[in-house]
Amino acid sequence: MKIQDRSLLIFLVLGILKSDAFNTRVKRHAPIRFQRSTRQSVVHFEFLDQEYVVDLEPNHSTFHENFKVFTQDGPQIVPRDEYIGTVREPRAGRAVLTQLEENVYIGSLYFVDDTLHLEPSYPHQLSDDLGPVVGYFESDLDLNLDLSAMPVRNQVSFRRANPFLKHRRAIAIPSDRRKDVLNVKRNRCTLKLVADYSFYSIFGKNNTGIVTKFLVNMIARVNEIYTPINWDVGKEDDISGRGRFQNMGFSIKEIKVLDRPNASDSHYNSYSRIWEVERLLREFAFAEGSKDFCLVHLVTARTFREVATLGLAYVSYKKWDETAGGICSKQETFNGRVAYINVLLSTSFANSEQSTYPLITKEIDIVVSHEYGHAWGATHDPTIDSDDPDVEECSPNDQNGGKYLMSQYAQKGYDANNVLFSPCSRKLIRDVLIGKWESCFQEEMTSFCGNGIVEDGEECDNGVDTDNEFNCCDKFCRLAVGAKCSPLNHICCTPTCQFHNSTHVCLPGDSLLCKADAVCNGFSGECPSAPPVRDGQECLEGGECLNGVCLPFCEKMSIGKKSCICEDLELSCRLCCRDYNGTCAPVPGHVYLRDGVRCSKGSCRDRKCVNEVVDNVRNYFLITFQTTGGVLEFIKTHIVVIAIIFFTLIFVGIYKIVKYGENFTEKVTHKTAGGCRSVFVKADVN
C-alpha cells in the first residue's frame, strides 16, 4: 500500500494463525510463584529458578484526574492497584504491574535485551482459577504478529547505574518559557475504554474489578511504547513557542463495563450477533463516540465475519477541515444520525479458519499500539517496489540502515532503523499533534510527595510505604535528623539511613550483558556504573564483549562485519552478515535462524520466510458505498454538497454552449462582410 493512498480505515489482520494456540506461540513458559513481602512497595516472585525483586510505586500517570468506572447499573468504586517499578534482582529493569488480588500480579518487566510478561493462565485454559499467573520472555515467542512496535533497546528508559533513584525526568525548558508551552503539560490523549459483555465474561470472569485492572495495565504497557518517543527529532528549530512533543501518551478518563448483553440485535453489545467489523465500529461510534475524549476504544473478545481481523481504527488528519477520524475528531452526521468518529476497536480473540483462541499479552500490546498509532495519524511507510518519491528515505534497504518501525513488514531489530520511526511516520504524527493536541490533549496527573519518586524540592519519598520499618524520610519528603539517605530511594543506603561501604554490591553483574558487579563508593547513595567484564567473553546470541558492550555475532573481532537480514526471501532465514562494502550475505555453513525469528517479510518457519501481517486499507468514504443502502445514506448525508456540484456542472455546461455560439456567430459575420471591405467585430462578452 502506498502512502499517497491516504487511507483512513486500517484493518490489522492476522495473516497466518496456528491451531495449537498458547503452547505453540510460547515456546517456554512457567507458573509464577509470588512471595509475600513485609513491605507493601516490594514484590518478590520466582520464575525459572530465579528470584525477581521489584520495587513498586503507584502509577498515577495512566489515570485522568477525574477517572471513573461505570457499569450498566451506574458508577462503581474500584480500588487502584496499578504500579510502575524498578526491577532490583536478578538484573536491572523497569516494571508495569497490576495487582489482581493479594500476591497476584500481571504486567510486564522490561529489560535491556528482553521483556518478561506475566498474565493470568485462565484465558488460555491453563487454569480455571484467577490466581495462577504464567510468565514468559519475548525471546521465547513464535508470534504471527509484527513485533516491531514493542519496546526495544532504544525505546525503554533504564537507569542501570542506580535503579532505586527515581527522579522524574523533566524536559529542559527555561523557566521563563514554561508558562507558554502548554503541551509540555497537556501531553495525554484521554481515553474512554468500553469493555463489552464478551470481554467482561471471558477475560474479566464476570468481575468488573478484574476488567478494570486488565484495561489499566494494558494502557500502562502501551504508554511504555509511546512516551519515550520524541516526535520533534530533527525539527527542534520549528517548535516556535511550544515544548517538545515527547512524553506524549494516554490517560484513562472513563471505563465502561457492560456486564450483560444488550437485547437489541443491532446494538454493538449484542452477544448473539456475528458482526462485520466495519458495521460494528460504525454502530459503536453512534452510541459512544464523544467530544469529551481524545479517543473512545471498544475492547471486545468477539470474532468477526472477516476471518483474522483483530482491530479497526480511523486515521487522523492534521487539519480540522479534512476528513474526520482518529484523535480529536469533529462531529459528523450520517443519515440524520450524529456521531463522533474518534473511535476504534480491538479484539482479544484471534479467529482463523481452523480455530479461535485468546491473544497473549504481547499480541494485545501490538494490536492496541498499532491501532492507536493509526488514530494518531500514522500510515505505513512506502514499500520498496512502490513509486512513492519518499521510498528511498522512508524505506531504505539493509545497506542504508534497514526498514523503519512503521514498515509494512515485520523486523527483528538487527538494523539501526528497525527501532526508529521513519521521516514519513514522524512527519505524519507530528503534523497531527501540531494541529490537534491543544483541542483535546490534557495534563498528565501531577506528582506529589508520597508517590515514591524523588522530585524537585524533595530529599526522599517513601511512596506507598505506610509502616515505620524505615524512619529515614518524613511525611514531608525530607530526610530525618541524622539521616543521609533513604533505602527506599537509594540503593547504596542502609536500613539505618547511612551510606553503604565500598564493598557493598549494589547492582549484580550480568555476563550476558558484559557487565560486572557494581559496588557502592561509601559516600553516596547512588550506585556507580557497572564495570565491564573482560573483552572477548561470550555474551547474548553468540556475541562477544568489548569494552562492556555485547557485540552481535557478526560484529565479533574475528568476523568484523555487521548484522543484517538478507532481503532475498530464499536466504532471509539464514544467519546473515553485512560486509564493509554493504553486501548482506549468509555466513558460511548454512546456519539457519530458529522459527519465529524475524526475516525480511515476516518470520521464519521451517527455514522459510513467511509473510504474516497485512494491513488491509480502505478509504473512509468508501464505506458508505459497500451496499445500495450505503449509497442512499451517502446521498442523504451530503445532499447539499451534491446539489451544489450538480447545478455548478449544469451552469458551466450552459456557459460553454453560449460562448461557443457567440464565437461561431462572430466568425460567420466576419466572413460574410469581407466583400464590402467592412469588418464587423462583435464585442467580447468576456
From Swiss-Prot:
Residues of the Disintegrin domain: 446-535
EC number annotated for this UniProt entry: 3.4.24.-
Needed co-factor(s): Zn(2+)
Domain of life of the organism encoding this protein: Eukaryota
Disulphide bond pairs: 328-440, 394-424, 506-527
Active site: 371
Membrane topology, Cytoplasmic segments: 659-686
GO molecular function, one term: metal ion binding
Protein name in UniProt: Disintegrin and metalloproteinase domain-containing protein 17 homolog
The organism of origin for this protein: Caenorhabditis elegans
